[in-house]
Regions:
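Structured segments of extracytoplasmic/periplasmic soluble domains
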Residues: 65-68, 86-91, 108, 125, ...
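Extended active-site neighborhood of metal-dependent phosphoesterases/phosphodiesterases
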Residues: 35, 39-45, 110-229, 268, ...
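Loop/turn elements at helix/coil->beta-strand transitions in domains of secreted/extracellular proteins
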Residues: 55-58, 94-99, 128-134, 191-194, ...
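N-terminal active-site segment of His-dependent metallophosphoesterases
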Residues: 8-115
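Active-site neighborhood of phospho(di)ester-bond hydrolases with catalytic His/Asp-centered motifs
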Residues: 61-63, 99-104, 133-139, 243-247, ...
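Solvent-exposed loop/turn segments at secondary-structure junctions
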Residues: 65-68, 105-108, 139-144, 200-205, ...
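Acidic, His/Gly-rich catalytic cores of divalent-metal-dependent hydrolytic chemistry
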Residues: 353-358, 365-389
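Active-site-proximal segments of metal-dependent phosphoesterases and phosphodiesterases across multiple
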Residues: 205-227, 235-306
Length: 389
């Protein structure tokens, strides 16, 4: 209780600050814990390193850190920010190709000044790392959880807050590409491998009397412009092994959309790409999420999308739909088993603060020569799983 009160005092923002200066000072005191970095480094040295070659792509991946201005010993809190520091510390030491965060950097339940400060801190840590990085937007990253708990429910984040703090910096790196300055689709190339990042929180920011038409935390989707951009990128993807990444799962094991809008259309587009088809992608909607576009994947050579990797669900799962592997990774954020919102998957891990089970993260190694994607988990994560690509 004393720890919580100290943290609360230090993290209380001054009125009208865009980013809380006190939050920034507090976060900059956080350091990687040697027992954690030694453990993660051991996972890399013993399990991952033997698979690394000049042709492979090796990534450090975190998802759902849910950083929050609270020094909690059993649930979401500052631990999420520290997990980023520790993962990037090891990445620097072993010279990985790419650091990826699959979204929900923050819990989005703090005052806006604090949430913006947490986002800024995380981005700055990724920027200081040696490897390039990509941070995807999660459904908590627009601070709508905070808005839900307020009586008037007005939007605490402005339209461009997240983009100005996070998204724009992804694309200031020469290794990260997009079609144009407003596209929500990014990609990274290394030799025969292409990793494409899509935004599953592609929701229009529309205000009505100060409140949002769509709650970003509750609504997930992909709009027509993003699908057009993805189509254009895929049409120019020739002789590549393609891995897709997003925050939320796009489709269920039964083939139904797992997004509120157009997850099934993303899947249909990927299947058409693998089949080298030409045709039309269309839904029955109008307005914000209506889609009607054409594609031609007949000239993409032997390119194939084999895998879609995401977080969001706070558990692990993998399944195949139309020959595409869909892989869900566990949340980095601490979820103690006594909390009501803790998933059954994390209850089984009995995750505890200041123990290895506190964290959950992954190394992913993609090998175009062995046609294999390997995932090496650490902390509250499956130690090893392999997929054909």
């Amino acid at each position: 209780l004393k720890i919580k009160n100290i943290a609360r005092k230090m993290l209380t923002p001054k009125p009208s600050e865009f980013v809380s200066a006190q939050t920034d000072i507090f976060l900059k005191r956080l350091k990687p814990r040697p027992f954690v970095t030694d453990y993660i480094r051991g996972v890399y040295d013993n399990n991952v390193k033997p698979n690394v070659t000049d042709d492979t792509v090796t990534l450090s991946v975190l998802t759902d850190t849910h950083a929050k201005a609270l020094a909690s010993a059993s649930y979401y809190g500052i631990n999420g920010a520290r997990h980023i520091i520790e993962a990037n510390n090891v990445s620097d030491a072993v010279h990985l190709d790419l650091n990826v965060h699959l979204g929900d950097l923050i819990d989005g339940s703090d005052k806006p000044e604090i949430s913006r400060g947490l986002l800024q801190f995380a981005v700055e840590n990724y920027q200081r790392s040696k490897a390039p990085y990509y941070i995807l937007e999660g459904n908590h990253d627009e601070n709508d959880k905070y808005d839900e708990h307020r009586f008037f429910g007005s939007a605490s984040f402005h339209r461009d807050d997240y983009d100005s703090l996070v998204t724009k910096y992804n694309f200031e790196q020469p290794e990260i590409h997009r079609l144009n300055p407003v596209s929500k689709v990014g990609w990274y190339d290394k030799k025969d491998i292409r990793i494409i990042f899509i935004d599953t929180s592609d929701i229009p920011y529309i205000l009505s009397n100060g409140s949002k038409k769509y709650d970003f935390k509750k609504v997930r989707g992909v709009r027509e412009q993003q699908l057009e951009d993805l189509t254009a990128i895929l049409e120019k993807t020739i002789d590549k092994h393609v891995v897709m990444m997003g925050h939320a799962n796009i489709i269920s094991p039964s083939g139904r959309s797992a997004l509120n809008f157009n997850g099934d259309l993303v899947q249909r587009l990927l299947v058409a790409f693998n089949n080298k088809d030409s045709g039309q992608l269309k839904n029955e909607l109008t307005g914000d999420f209506g889609v009607n576009l054409r594609y031609d994947f007949s000239s993409t050579g032997i390119s194939k999308v084999t895998t879609y990797i995401c977080g969001h669900m706070h558990y692990e799962k993998n399944y195949k739909v139309s020959e595409i592997n869909h892989i869900i990774l566990n949340c980095s954020a601490l979820m103690g088993k006594k909390h009501g919102l803790t998933t059954d998957y994390n209850k089984k891990w009995d995750r505890r603060y200041n123990e290895i089970s506190e964290l959950a993260g992954y190394f992913i190694n993609i090998d175009p020569n062995k046609l294999r994607l390997q995932i090496f988990g650490y902390g509250a994560a499956t130690r090893y799983v392999s997929f054909e690509i």
